[in-house]
Amino acid sequence: MAQVELILLQRVEHLGQMGEVVKVKPGYARNFLLPQAKAVRATKQNRERFERERAHLEAQNLKRREEAERVAERVAGLTVTLIRQASDAGSLYGSVTSRDIADACGEASLGITRSQVLLVHPIKTLGLATVRVALHPEVLIDVVVNVARSPEEAEKQARGEAIMREESEYELETGEEVAEGPEQTA
């Protein structure tokens, strides 16, 4: 399959640094890099224009990076709390997505978009989770997400206390045996 040559206008993870000429599949160029203004086609005119504007683009990138580093210092160790409904076993009814985390960070005066939240898979259980947020392609911070059923429960989790009762504790309190799974009959 044919590949397209592009000049990167900014650092793109797993692809290259600003100014590099890279070859990518046409769909990746057409659907992501070109519309997001992360790259331009590597034509003769674009190469010449990029070389003329390189210093300006590098200065802009440096300014954005420094601003992101200042924000990262200000919010180091940020913890956001999300209150969700969950079963007694701790499974959420629904899940916490990158949009939920971005909204919670926005309330904490950290204006980020959901595309900046690097969440591999949605959070589906109560507890603490560490999520990476890309303030700039070169500046990543860790945000602790505290998912709980109530603000009181969130405080307990933040202190490191267990909120889920163990099955053995439940058995001691109630005298009932917790079922392991469906009984099998022969």
From Swiss-Prot:
InterPro entries: Ribosomal_bL9, Ribosomal_bL9/RNase_H1_N, Ribosomal_bL9_bac/chp, Ribosomal_bL9_C, Ribosomal_bL9_C_sf, Ribosomal_bL9_N, Ribosomal_bL9_N_sf. Residues 151-167 have a biased composition (Basic and acidic residues). Residues 151-186 are annotated as: Disordered. Pfam families: Ribosomal_L9_C, Ribosomal_L9_N. It comes from the Bacteria. GO terms for molecular function: rRNA binding; structural constituent of ribosome. GO terms for biological process: translation. Keywords: Ribonucleoprotein, Ribosomal protein, RNA-binding, rRNA-binding. Residues 168-180 have a biased composition (Acidic residues). GO terms for cellular component: ribonucleoprotein complex; ribosome. Binds to the 23S rRNA. Belongs to the bacterial ribosomal protein bL9 family. This is Large ribosomal subunit protein bL9. The gene is rplI.
